[in-house]
């Protein structure tokens, strides 16, 4: 469950290391986001020479969440950390690599490029 002021690890090589959620997109009074939801975030820490800089406002998709996500077969999937991938407006990632596992639910929301770059899809 990601809400405003939540800090997330960045799971790609776009240059950002940590982002803070400003808004969960999809509805005027939406409070929480989970895996596969798009958020607007501010870059809180970044590596020097990266594509994105500290203080930039970016869009990102949540790829890992500590809060469990219930699947249709009744099983749950949860991760050890909250993580996101910074995306462009066309749903493609800004970076060229994805680090760590991502959930299969991203396929339903048409983030196919992220799934193809990920080392493991759970």
Curated annotation (Swiss-Prot):
SUPFAM superfamilies: Ribosomal protein L14
A GO cellular component entry from the record: cytosolic large ribosomal subunit
GO-annotated molecular function: large ribosomal subunit rRNA binding; structural constituent of ribosome
Annotated PROSITE patterns: RIBOSOMAL_L14
Keywords: Ribonucleoprotein, Ribosomal protein, RNA-binding, rRNA-binding
The keyword Membrane belongs to this UniProt entry's keyword annotation: no
Gene Ontology biological process terms, A to Z: translation
Top-level taxon of origin: Bacteria
InterPro entries: Ribosomal_uL14, Ribosomal_uL14_bac-type, Ribosomal_uL14_CS, Ribosomal_uL14_sf
Quaternary structure and partners: Part of the 50S ribosomal subunit. Forms a cluster with proteins L3 and L19. In the 70S ribosome, L14 and L19 interact and together make contacts with the 16S rRNA in bridges B5 and B8.
NCBIfam families found in the cross-reference section: rplN_bact
Listed HAMAP family: Ribosomal_uL14 (MF_01367)
Family, per entry: Belongs to the universal ribosomal protein uL14 family.
Purpose of the protein: Binds to 23S rRNA. Forms part of two intersubunit bridges in the 70S ribosome.
Name of this chain's protein: Large ribosomal subunit protein uL14
Organism: Clostridium botulinum (strain Hall / ATCC 3502 / NCTC 13319 / Type A)
Species classification: Bacteria, Bacillati, Bacillota, Clostridia, Eubacteriales
